[in-house]
Curated annotation (Swiss-Prot):
K(+) binds at G224, G226, C229, E394, S395, H396. It comes from Borreliella burgdorferi (strain ATCC 35210 / DSM 4680 / CIP 102532 / B31). The active site is at C229, R325. This is Inosine-5'-monophosphate dehydrogenase. Homotetramer. Its cofactor is K(+).
Length: 404
């Protein structure tokens, strides 16, 4: 009888990175990375295409910091197009001179508060100079992406998103190594050969090679690692994230195809590990869902503020439009839907900028330990050790009463 257990597979908590001799200071590293061969990011972060994570407000906020947001598809074609247009037409408020005057139209913050001192107006105005790392296209517009899947109106949706000048599309599926996904990529690439496509989600080298062969520009890795995803327990399918990234990287190594690690990021150290395993960037849902900029509902529970966080495989999300992501488009009876996600809530965490500051800081620190001046260095030169449960326990604060 053949051995069906092919190998051991590991995730973030199963490994730790080995520090290397380094002349690199965290403050000296570059976080710039490639999303595709045509699109670069100034920070390796994407906001997830989830209806409680990314609409135009989130996409604008993350693009201003150097990343990119992916507008979810649980809305009409026209609504999704308008969300893209809000990002692409976003304008920074005009800079006010230090004396409070300007030859340009005054920003709303100034005209709405007539009694502010001029110096206060200057402090409150938003300046282009405040966002030197903003992710912009060749026309100096903020970049943004959008998700599509296998729906009856997918090609029509793509056409409208292209008209809105979307920068990149995500072919969004729970199982990217599907003949339907492969055929959809072929159709889109035939009609729009210069449109960059992210395809996923996948976890194997074979899937990567098949998607690359039909024109995928970037691959999204992750089946089941997300905090609100239940695919691994409902369907029994998935590969732990570190191993999945490593396997896909094996197919993409020495090519210009980039990798996004999607799901399972809880700490900044997980970002470092994901990139060290072979990812060029990470996609985040949970950590961004609690921010001010997410479109999710605010909830007060036991006197504390939370925001809703809903898996795209949950019943409610499927009803709103994500059935096709899980190949249940033909199922029109809610009672017959098989969910692969849950609904929950996460603590309100304030501005996205503050969350990104912590994630970037942890990544920069890790790069310093590993002697990696660039994201590429981190991918190529890093090595892991497998750790025990006791090692994991040792890695977290222990034997103290925490006061912060």
């Amino acid at each position: 009888m053949p051995n069906k257990i092919t190998k051991e597979a590991l995730t973030f908590d199963d490994v730790s990175l080995i520090p290397r001799k380094s002349s690199v200071l965290p403050s000296e590293v570059s976080l710039k990375t490639q999303l595709t061969k045509n699109i670069s990011l100034n920070i390796p972060f994407l906001s997830s295409a989830m209806d409680t994570v990314t609409e135009s407000q989130m996409a604008i906020a993350i693009a201003k910091e150097g990343g990119i947001g992916i507008i979810h598809k649980n809305m009409s074609i026209e609504a999704q197009r308008k969300e893209i247009e809000k990002v692409k037409t976003y304008k920074f408020q005009k800079t006010i001179n230090t004396n409070g005057d300007t030859n340009e139209q005054k920003p709303e913050i100034f005209t709405a508060k007539q009694h502010l001192e001029k110096s206060d107006a200057y402090k409150n105005a938003e300046h282009k100079e405040d966002f030197p790392n903003a992710c912009k296209d060749l026309n100096n517009k903020l970049r943004v992406g959008a998700a599509v899947s296998i729906d009856i109106d997918t090609i029509e949706r793509v056409e409208e998103l292209v008209k809105a000048h979307v920068d990149i599309l995500v072919i969004d599926s729970a199982h990217g190594h599907s003949t339907r996904i492969i055929e959809l990529i072929k159709k889109i690439k035939t009609k729009y050969p210069n449109l960059d496509l992210i395809a996923g989600n996948i976890v194997t080298k074979e899937a990567a090679l098949d998607l690359i062969s039909v024109g995928a520009d970037c691959l999204k890795v992750g089946i089941g690692p997300g905090s609100i995803c239940t695919t691994r327990i409902v369907a029994g399918v998935g590969v732990p994230q570190i191993t999945a990234i490593c396997d896909v990287y094996e197919a993409c190594n020495n090519t210009n195809i980039c990798i996004i690690a999607d799901g399972g990021i809880r700490f900044s150290g997980d970002v470092v590990k994901a990139i060290a395993a072979g990812a060029d960037s990470v996609m985040i849902g949970n950590l961004f869902a609690g921010t001010k900029e997410s479109p999710s509902e605010e909830i007060i529970y036991n006197g504390k503020k939370f925001k809703s966080y809903v898996g795209m495989g949950s019943i409610s999300a499927m009803k709103r439009g994500s059935k096709s992501r899980y190949f249940q488009l033909e199922n029109n009876e809610p009672k017959k839907l098989v969910p692969e996600g849950i609904e929950g809530m996460v603590p309100y965490s304030g501005k996205l900028k503050d969350i990104l500051t912590q994630l970037k800081g942890g990544l920069m620190s890790g790069m310093g330990y590993l002697g990696a001046a660039t994201i590429s260095d981190l991918k190529i030169n890093s090595k892991f050790v497998k750790i025990s449960h006791s090692s994991l326990k040792e890695s977290h604060p222990h034997d103290v009463f925490s006061i912060t």
